[in-house]
Structures are given as C-alpha cells and as structure tokens.
A protein has these predicted regions:
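A solvent-exposed, acidic/Ser-Thr-rich amphipathic alpha-helical stretch
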Residues: 21-24, 28-76
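Hydrophobic pocket/interface hotspot
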Residues: 8-11, 23-24, 31, 49, ...
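Short, mixed-charge, low-aromatic patches
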Residues: 5-14, 36-40, 57-61, 81-83
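Short, low-complexity N-terminal intrinsically disordered segments enriched in polar/charged residues
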Residues: 1-29, 126-127
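A beta-strand edge to alpha-helix "cap/lid" segment located at domain peripheries
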Residues: 3, 54-127
C-alpha cells in the first residue's frame, strides 16, 4: 500500500473516531475541497473545510459514517470508493449511499478532495 493511500486511510480513521483536529492536521494549508451537495468550503484551507463541511455535517446528521471499501492509487492521486450513511437530525430519515472520493496528496498532506455522491438520495433524507 502506498504512503498516499495510507494518508487517506488515516483521514477516514480520524473521521470515524470523531477526531476532527487529527483529520484537519492531515490537510495542506491551502487544501481545495469540492463537494456535490450543499456543504461547501467557502475558501481554501482546513479551517474552511471544518466550518463549511465537517461541522455542519456533524450538527445536521447523527450516526454519520464514511466507510471506504476500496482504494485505488496512481502516484499522488487516490480514489476511495465506499458508503456514506447517517440519520438526518430533523427528519429522522436514514441515508445510505455509495460515494467516490478523489484525493490529491502533495508533500505528505492532502492537497485536494473531490466528492461524487448520490445527491438526490441525500436531499430526500433532508426533507
């Protein structure tokens, strides 16, 4: 397994442990974070990811899990395939969808993230 894959695996491990400081420490200072749903990092950097993505998800959902099942690496690019699940805090609806996450690693830190997910299923759980 490559160092890049191990780094991304460490990120998911930190999320599963609800250890946001450890997850954020794995990111480059100017990380670019791109999502397909309404949670957005409104700038570059770990603080923007925390404020625009991670904190809102944890506030809006319970039983949150990002569970990777496969990692594919090519140099500094890592793709993780897995499932996102959770229960929406207001509607009490459960979502369980597949995702593809594309990561770029530079200098031993996460430089970029792109998310691909079933946005309709997530949106339906929110209403």
């Amino acid at each position: 397994m490559t160092q890049q894959i191990e780094l991304i695996r460490s990120f998911y491990t930190a999320l599963a442990a609800e250890d946001a400081p450890r997850a954020l420490a794995l990111m480059a200072d100017d990380i670019e974070w791109t999502t397909m749903w309404h949670y957005k990092a409104l700038g570059r950097g770990p603080q923007h990811v925390a404020e625009g993505v991670l904190m809102p998800i944890m506030q809006e959902w319970t039983e949150v899990a990002f569970v990777p099942s496969e990692f594919i690496g090519d140099g500094d690019t890592v793709v993780s395939l897995g499932r996102f699940s959770g229960v929406h805090g207001i509607t009490d609806k459960r979502v369980d969808v597949r995702y593809a996450h594309a990561w770029t690693v530079e200098g031993g830190r996460i430089a970029s993230f792109r998310q691909y997910i079933d946005t309709l299923a997530v949106a339906e759980a929110r209403v």
